[in-house]
């Protein structure tokens, strides 16, 4: 604890700053303790010329000052002092620290690393077969900041299994436990940061980007990881290049020019720059001078907060800068801590007392730690007081303290006395360590990484230096606040960076060239659809589905058949009503006048049977509309053909009788006429119907019609219909009827009618003509009409056939019965003279009269 006098001096120094006297900050970078922690911080930067001209293994001179490095060192100092003042973490023990400057150069970081590994109380690193009992000067190391340095120092510390906790090295390679078994860090690895960057590109629809990295291990590995992440998300890298690290001469300027030329050639509007600070500075320095068009820059954490890059003149013209910074707990007391220690560093009495207390730390070996730190003021470091990585340093110290607490098995009363803890013993308790810092729970995973959230930062220019504004967050998934983002475009519209335009709904990509992001948009045809926006081929609908052109989904097909409510069916039902009404009317008249010469000349009971059959033909039409079923399909043809056969067989008997009476000799006519009337006539009808039954049975057994669903006939519907399996068998089912009609026509076409008598042959001739015209027209019409309308065609053919027979044969007789009853005489219909009334019952007399 600081004494009252010191506190008073510090208060006086804060009230009277800027005396111009040198500070003693460099003497505050070391403190003794029971266990000492080493620290590697970029307190300064070495001159490039000095590094290139180095010919002897001497230490380079670090002349330039790094304010962030000093603040991070003070954060470690504050954390150690807090732990020493607490009674719950390491009671009774005191931590010390030994902080060194790395100059951000591996060659400079080597010397303090060797010093840390020297045996406690000496300057030497002795060679042993077994280092299990080896006690180095420090128990663990905090740092370094950069991955480049951690790659070098990590090999040293890993050999001795000395825990090393970096507060800024984020390279994924450092997670390899085989190579770096003692490496830990309080920042997420680059993979997490690059995953967030890839999610950002995907969020804004940027799939045509350039990816640049610094020409070092950090940049090369970052580009390798990003390439894999981008490919998995459908992001195309138009150009991938390395930015050379700057040197004192201009030998690498041409390479920077080539990189920028390639970026311009690729016409990208978004560039991922995963580079170190110096590489980013060199790239932007040349970009500004060459007037590179503004772009969206996705920054790596390494240069996003760099004053060196932010302060470049003209940097505001480079476009929009977005990047991710890790989120940690706020260290509210840290700014006051820095102010207090800067004030103490101006007090000669405090500095003198500090020098006496810290003697014996071998200054002659390490030299003055940070001479440039003794010439600063609060204004030099005020900009970085709230730097995001300050918390990482603070957390790194607490992680080591918690591991030491676990190793020593400390409790509220103290830590049990035991031999000094070796680094490898501490390391065993570092794995999967859980600790709390500032109320935030942290845990090292098996690779030594911590899981921390990222804030999405945007550069917002206020004057000559930008400020970082939060515009989103990443904790495994990205959330952005788009309304807060100010784009560099004139209308503040989000820039577009795509090789090809976004395909419209129902279009898929046809890739051209080598990049999957460069493509033509092709419409999906009917019957296919685009399932996902990134599809390169249309997905076909299932057979029970359909889709229009340029569709994004399929629709269920509805069943299509000849429904009852369709206009064609309604029209046919009207025709059915007409035909059935005429049949019933004719049947009623014939039954009522069944004993009249007209009805007897028309066949008597056979004529009534024929009309009943015509009525059944009309009713069979009702089997065709409606949803098809197996029973309907099987019944349609037999139930329409058999009644028609019965009707045609009665007409055939009429035609045969007329032919016999008119064309054959009288002796033959007398014998045959008896066979064409009475029981023998019914036998002919039965025989004809049995033949039709046989044909229909063969048709149903050999080639039964079946209900089928055709998914391809109609574009949007599933056609359900009765499929005829054999058109030959279908035609043979009509053979009996066609034969009867043909014989009727032949028997009546050339018959001479008797003058003064009713011409019975003419009605039969025209009835058969109507039959043939109907069914001959039916064949080509059925072959060319849509399948769904085929039942309607057959319905129409049946009804027209019935109407034709009625109109030609039955209706004229009905007219005579109703309008000219005086002609309903035996003489007019049977051919006898006016006084020969008995001739109607005498077959021979009747036949003689006809021939006369």
Swiss-Prot record:
Its main location: membrane. Changing residue 537 to G: Retains partial activity toward brazzein; however response to other sweeteners tested is suppressed. The keyword Flavoprotein does not apply. It comes from the Eukaryota. GO terms for biological process: detection of chemical stimulus involved in sensory perception of sweet taste; G protein-coupled receptor signaling pathway; sensory perception of sweet taste; sensory perception of umami taste. The chain crosses the membrane at residues 571-591, 604-624, 640-660, 683-703, 730-750, 763-783, 790-810. Residues 1-20 form the signal peptide. It is found in: Cell membrane. One of its GO terms (cellular component) is Golgi apparatus. It is a multi-pass membrane protein. This is Taste receptor type 1 member 3. Putative taste receptor. TAS1R1/TAS1R3 responds to the umami taste stimulus (the taste of monosodium glutamate). TAS1R2/TAS1R3 recognizes diverse natural and synthetic sweeteners. TAS1R3 is essential for the recognition and response to the disaccharide trehalose. Sequence differences within and between species can significantly influence the selectivity and specificity of taste responses. Residues 536-545 are annotated as: Required for brazzein responsiveness. Residues 21-570, 625-639, 704-729, 784-789 are extracellular. Forms homodimers or heterodimers with TAS1R1 and TAS1R2. Keywords: Cell membrane, G-protein coupled receptor, Glycoprotein, Membrane, Receptor, Sensory transduction, Signal, Taste, Transducer, Transmembrane, Transmembrane helix. Residues 592-603, 661-682, 751-762, 811-852 are cytoplasmic. It comes from Homo sapiens (Human). Coiled coil: none annotated. Changing residue 540 to L: Reduces the response to monellin.
């Amino acid at each position: 604890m600081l004494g009252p006098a010191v506190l008073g001096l510090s208060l006086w120094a804060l009230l009277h700053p800027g005396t111009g006297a040198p500070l003693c900050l460099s003497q505050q970078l070391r403190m003794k303790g029971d266990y000492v922690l080493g620290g590697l911080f970029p307190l300064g930067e070495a001159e490039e010329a000095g590094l290139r001209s180095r010919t002897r293994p001497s230490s380079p001179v670090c002349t330039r000052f790094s304010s962030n490095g000093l603040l991070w060192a003070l954060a470690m100092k504050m954390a150690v002092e807090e732990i020493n003042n607490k009674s719950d973490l390491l009671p009774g023990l005191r931590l010390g620290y030994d902080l060194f400057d790395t100059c951000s150069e591996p060659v400079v970081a080597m010397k303090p690393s060797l010093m840390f590994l020297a045996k406690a109380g000496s300057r030497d690193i002795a060679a042993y077969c077994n280092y299990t009992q080896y006690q180095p000067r420090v128990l663990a190391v905090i740092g370094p900041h950069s991955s480049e340095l951690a790659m070098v120092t990590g090999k040293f510390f890993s050999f001795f299994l000395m825990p090393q906790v970096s507060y800024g090295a984020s390279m994924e390679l450092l997670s390899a436990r085989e190579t770096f078994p003692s490496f830990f860090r309080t920042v997420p690895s680059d993979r997490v940061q690059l995953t967030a960057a890839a999610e950002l590109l995907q969020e804004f629809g940027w799939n045509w980007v350039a990816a640049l990295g610094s020409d070092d291990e950090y940049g090369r590995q970052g580009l390798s990881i990003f390439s894999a992440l981008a490919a998995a998300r459908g992001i195309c890298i138009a150009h991938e290049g390395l930015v050379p690290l700057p040197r004192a001469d201009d030998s690498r300027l041409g390479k920077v020019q080539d990189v920028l030329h390639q970026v311009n050639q690729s016409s990208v509007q978004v560039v991922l720059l995963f580079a170190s600070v110096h590489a980013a500075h060199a790239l932007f320095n040349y970009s500004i001078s060459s007037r590179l068009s503004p772009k969206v820059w996705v920054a790596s954490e390494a240069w996003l907060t760099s004053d060196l890059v932010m302060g470049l003149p003209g940097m505001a013209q480079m476009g929009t800068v977005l990047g991710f910074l890790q989120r940690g707990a706020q260290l509210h007391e840290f700014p006051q801590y820095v102010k207090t220690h800067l004030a103490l560093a101006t007090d000669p009495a405090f500095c003198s007392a500090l020098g006496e207390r810290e003697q014996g730390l071998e200054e002659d070996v390490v030299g003055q730690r940070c001479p440039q730190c003794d010439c600063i003021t609060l204004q030099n470091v005020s900009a970085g007081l709230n730097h995001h990585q300050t918390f990482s340093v603070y957390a790194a110290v607490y992680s080591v303290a918690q591991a030491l607490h676990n190793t020593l098995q400390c409790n509220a009363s103290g830590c049990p006395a035991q031999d000094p803890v070796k680094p490898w013993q501490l390391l065993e308790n570092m794995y999967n360590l859980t600790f709390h810092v500032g109320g935030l729970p942290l845990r090292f995973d098996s690779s030594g990484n911590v899981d921390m959230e990222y804030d999405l930062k945007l550069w917002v220019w206020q004057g000559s230096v930008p400020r970082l504004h939060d515009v989103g967050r990443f904790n495994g998934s990205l959330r952005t606040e788009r309304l807060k983002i100010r784009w560099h475009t004139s209308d503040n519209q989000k820039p577009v960076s795509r090789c090809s335009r976004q395909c419209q709904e129902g279009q898929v990509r046809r890739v051209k060239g080598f990049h999957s992001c460069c493509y033509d948009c092709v419409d999906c045809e009917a019957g296919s659809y685009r399932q996902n926006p990134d599809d390169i081929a249309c997905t076909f609908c299932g057979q029970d589905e359909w889709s229009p052109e340029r569709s994004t989904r399929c629709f269920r097909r509805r069943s299509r058949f000849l429904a009852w409510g369709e206009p064609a069916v309604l029209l046919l039902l009207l025709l059915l009503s007409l035909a059935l009404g005429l049949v019933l009317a004719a049947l009623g008249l014939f039954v009522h006048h069944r004993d009249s010469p007209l009805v007897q000349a028309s066949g008597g009971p056979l004529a009534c049977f024929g009309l009943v059959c015509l009525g059944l033909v009309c009713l069979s039409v009702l089997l065709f509309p409606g949803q098809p079923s197996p029973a309907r399909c099987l019944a349609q043809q037999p139930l329409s053909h058999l009644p028609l056969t019965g009707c045609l067989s009665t007409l055939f008997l009429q035609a045969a009788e007329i032919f016999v009476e008119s064309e054959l000799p009288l002796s033959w006519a007398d014998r045959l006429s008896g066979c064409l009337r009475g029981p023998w006539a019914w036998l002919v009808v039965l025989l004809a119907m049995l033949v039709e039954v046989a044909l229909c049975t063969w048709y149903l057994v050999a080639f039964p019609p079946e209900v089928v669903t055709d998914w391809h006939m109609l574009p949007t519907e599933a056609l359900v219909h009765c499929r005829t399996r054999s058109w030959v068998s279908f035609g043979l089912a009509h053979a009996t009827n066609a034969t009867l009609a043909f014989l009727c026509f032949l028997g009546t076409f050339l018959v001479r009618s008797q003058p003064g008598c009713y011409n019975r042959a003419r009605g039969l001739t025209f009835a058969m003509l109507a039959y043939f015209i109907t069914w001959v027209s039916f064949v080509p019409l059925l072959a060319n009409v849509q399948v769904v309308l085929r039942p309607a065609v057959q319905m129409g053919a049946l009804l027209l056939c019935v109407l034709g027979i009625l109109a030609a044969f039955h209706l004229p007789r009905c007219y005579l019965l109703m309008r000219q009853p005086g002609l309903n005489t035996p003489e007019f219909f049977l051919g006898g003279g006016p006084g020969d009334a008995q001739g109607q019952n005498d077959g021979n007399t009747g036949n003689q009269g006809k021939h006369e």
